[in-house]
């Protein structure tokens, strides 16, 4: 067995022992030893392999798998620009704390700076965005394979520990750079997938128990308190009775408080869970120096955009009790805000993305998974009052980019189907869909979702800018082109190019379409208007 083949087989074997169940592979020559080893493991049923031709979408497919599985997922690629294309996914994984392992095949390090083809200083390329950048070192002919086997397995365990946050409580992306020398394919007489042995019984070479990160924080609940639950909020049963502004990706709120209702009440303190990113009303409250903020997170970092947090911890140790009158008032304004939104939607003469979101919110139920685009859809779902128990909600909120959303949805759907057999509904805008349309390319030999519906709310451009400063009517002569970016893409034709079923329907037909039994992956396109979004949102606020 040649050294590169042995090294790749050992790495793959140890990754499987460490909990990796899915790997995304992009084709290339330099990563051929890894490709052969991964294919052997896939064929043996030890992991599930997904082959993609675009490294950028491959990275987000891996993120979708990792988030839904709550387990590390690898993406493997060749050297050169293939590595650079993982940049967006690595940044998202960093801030969303996703255990993404980037297996970067490299040329022997002595070729750096020589002008060798497809070669650059890729080890450490991701800089501060990864938990670790680890090099396996170059495999060479060596009489003591036992020593090399131990070194390779030990390094792989370090990668897994860093990605899972086993010693830091801070999961995230890791670069695992593996320089490989020719030959890059198995020897002609190497007829089996043999690899040097690991620990007996399939155990990890170096076992590291997960660290317990526990910082109790005493909080008196006597002052009128609201909970703001953002991305990665975690579950806090002793706070469940408090009025909670829960972003869609936060756990189900037993006592919901609509984000627009914050303008109708005067909280005396805030308990912030996770990382809120969506609502300006929330940002305004968190920045109020007269309102103490207690930040509870599941890891070592905590958000504090305004610098107003008074104390931090991981869980609350509570004293005192909320006033019944305060709880009653919050429940009342929550109902009022939800009714104001739904009432204005019913009265509005045009179909907008908010209307599409309302249908989707009402259609998903327990056991479903909902994937949301990072622009208007995730905000719209919150505004229409979505708060359904036992629905897994995913959205790339780490740095909230629109890139890779189709691929994230496919990865999440594959993981959700394997775990529960349930369906996945994705709600995304047209720009988000077009931006990652190559994510629809799933080869005929690759695992494909059997219960994925992608709802594309198509208002032919960037509807979110209608609601921002750039959408002010005084910029109307230029904003449509440089912010709205109309594209006139034929969504149906684009889907047909990738052999994905697509149907254009009216908003009034969407509920029935979502209720249909469907086997496979499909796109439901709903035409929407963005020119009236600003007026619609103004009428909602006026209705409060």
Swiss-Prot record:
General function of this protein: Catalyzes the thiamine diphosphate-dependent decarboxylation of 2-oxoglutarate and the subsequent addition of the resulting succinic semialdehyde-thiamine pyrophosphate anion to isochorismate to yield 2-succinyl-5-enolpyruvyl-6-hydroxy-3-cyclohexene-1-carboxylate (SEPHCHC).
Protein name (database record): 2-succinyl-5-enolpyruvyl-6-hydroxy-3-cyclohexene-1-carboxylate synthase
Keyword Transferase: yes
Catalytic activity reported: isochorismate + 2-oxoglutarate + H(+) = 5-enolpyruvoyl-6-hydroxy-2-succinyl-cyclohex-3-ene-1-carboxylate + CO2
Cross-referenced Pfam families: TPP_enzyme_N
Keywords assigned by UniProt, alphabetized: Magnesium, Manganese, Menaquinone biosynthesis, Metal-binding, Thiamine pyrophosphate, Transferase
Family, per entry: Belongs to the TPP enzyme family. MenD subfamily.
EC number assigned by the record: 2.2.1.9
InterPro entries, per the entry: MenaQ_synth_MenD (IPR004433), THDP-binding (IPR029061), Thiamin_PyroP_enz_TPP-bd_dom (IPR012001)
Swiss-Prot/TrEMBL cofactor(s): Mg(2+); Mn(2+); thiamine diphosphate
Pathway: Quinol/quinone metabolism; 1,4-dihydroxy-2-naphthoate biosynthesis; 1,4-dihydroxy-2-naphthoate from chorismate: step 2/7; Quinol/quinone metabolism; menaquinone biosynthesis
Entry's cofactor comment: Binds 1 thiamine pyrophosphate per subunit.
Complex and partners: Homodimer.
The organism of origin for this protein: Mycolicibacterium gilvum (strain PYR-GCK) (Mycobacterium gilvum (strain PYR-GCK))
Record-level GO BP terms: menaquinone biosynthetic process
GO molecular function: 2-succinyl-5-enolpyruvyl-6-hydroxy-3-cyclohexene-1-carboxylic-acid synthase activity; magnesium ion binding; manganese ion binding; thiamine pyrophosphate binding
